[in-house]
């Protein structure tokens, strides 16, 4: 998963600078892991069709972006969409509610769903319409240890998710 090297806003200001930042990060990932990233995530999940076209021109196959209700309206974030200006670029939309339930609300004892356990979370996903099979959960790394203190058992929750998903089928 590539992103601008500085995690800045170059995608909004300067196309050349944006390309340089993305290529710098992509090169670093390839150097460290031996594989070039194929999916892109812009700083703060910023997206426009113009940015999508630039990302596709850099060779990326997909892009992770925000699936906010005010943007989607009646549409669901649980499908793969495509960039209007570069139809080969697949758009993976973050499910903001499911993501924020972990990233922001997990340890909030005043939250109506507190405490949140992995089996309960997987049941929420399982209750989604059967045709909605693409669920993108994404949060900032700061959610682990900063927003959600390690004492909240956030790591144990995350470790239990794959097991609970497998048990659910």
What are these regions (language model features)?
Residues 1-38, 45-100, 115-132, 149-168:
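Catalytic alpha-helical scaffold of carbohydrate-active enzymes acting on polysaccharides/glycoconjugates
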Residues 39-42, 137-139:
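Extended hydrophobic secondary-structure segments that form protein cores and membrane-embedded regions
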Residues 89-108, 136-145:
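Active-site clefts of carbohydrate-active enzymes
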